[in-house]
Amino acid sequence: MIELTDVTCELTGKKILDNVSLKIPEGQTMVIVGSSGAGKSVTLKHIIGLMAPDSGKVLVNDKCIHDVKARELENIRNHMGILFQSGALINWMSIFDNIALPLREKTDLDESSIADKVRERLAMVDMQGTGEKMPSEVSGGMKKRAGLARAIVRDPAIILYDEPTSGLDPVLSRSIDTLIAEMQKRLNVTSIVVTHDLNTAYYVGDRIAMLHEGQIIINATPKDFAENKDPVVQKFVEAQHLAQT
């Protein structure tokens, strides 16, 4: 389980997170939505341990990640996979080497076992036969898929997605949504998806939490979120509909 309790964060005098509390049960997908600047990515950084709250606690499997020693924090992160907004592939490495990198740096697997694992993960994201290509030779959607393959290559218990469909057209966005849902079922992981795309939220989320002015104003099932009468939630939903018409 991942749990945030009364997390507060200020940056340059502005309160970005204001007593945020959120529980993500093991094996579920929590989607965090909100407008730009609402604190979505800052929340993700707290969960990863890249930022420590000014007050409050962030627990991952009952361990307070901003109080543990560096080695223990590294161990916690070793059980996380992260899909960055851009895919974050290393430009001078092939797709294969990008995906193999965590295995080479963090495990004692031999090259034959690494190759088997990389090919397996490429197949899971429908990128068979692309391992020798360079990032510059593949589309934005394929970069995201390769980034996802790298995120899951060490069998993480937790996967974090930062704007997974950002910059993609609607067709490619839905294909990434399908992959996220498939990974959840096949790997039985706990997932957190930060997005501004409600189509993604409705498709992959067990629950949707919305950040507004640094606070969680709703934490609900996709159905209840869509039907919620809170004016801030309704305005966000309506703005999404307008953007897609």
In which residue ranges do the predicted regions lie?
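Conserved ABC ATPase "signature" region
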Residues: K63-C64, E111-T130, A181
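Conserved ABC ATPase signature
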Residues: M134-V138, M142
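Helix-to-loop junction immediately C-terminal to a conserved catalytic motif
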Residues: I48
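Short coil-to-helix segment of the ABC ATPase nucleotide-binding domain corresponding to the Q-loop/switch region
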Residues: W92-L101
